[in-house]
Amino acid sequence: MMEVESSYSDFISCDRTGRRNAVPDIQGDSEAVSVRKLAGDMGELALEGAEGQAEGGTPDKEASNQPQSSDGTTSS
């Protein structure tokens, strides 16, 4: 119970108020990840996703271009 009371008093004494800001300050953890590393990781994800779509996406793309009637069948 003492742990809750001490964290409550720490929160009340800081300058962060309101619902949106009612979370602990996590800037210490965010400094461990660099923006350059994050951008590199995101670039790798985008490339892998684009390669997968180029290989297997062509037949699905052609099928999706065919108009469908109201009963769900494709018309030719």
From Swiss-Prot:
The keyword Iron does not apply. GO terms for molecular function: cAMP-dependent protein kinase inhibitor activity. Residues 1-10, 64-76 have a biased composition (Polar residues). Residues 47-57 have a biased composition (Low complexity). Residues 1-25, 47-76 are annotated as: Disordered. GO terms for biological process: negative regulation of protein import into nucleus; negative regulation of transcription by RNA polymerase II. One of its GO terms (cellular component) is cytoplasm. Keywords: Protein kinase inhibitor. Extremely potent competitive inhibitor of cAMP-dependent protein kinase activity, this protein interacts with the catalytic subunit of the enzyme after the cAMP-induced dissociation of its regulatory chains. Belongs to the PKI family. This is cAMP-dependent protein kinase inhibitor gamma. It comes from Sus scrofa (Pig).
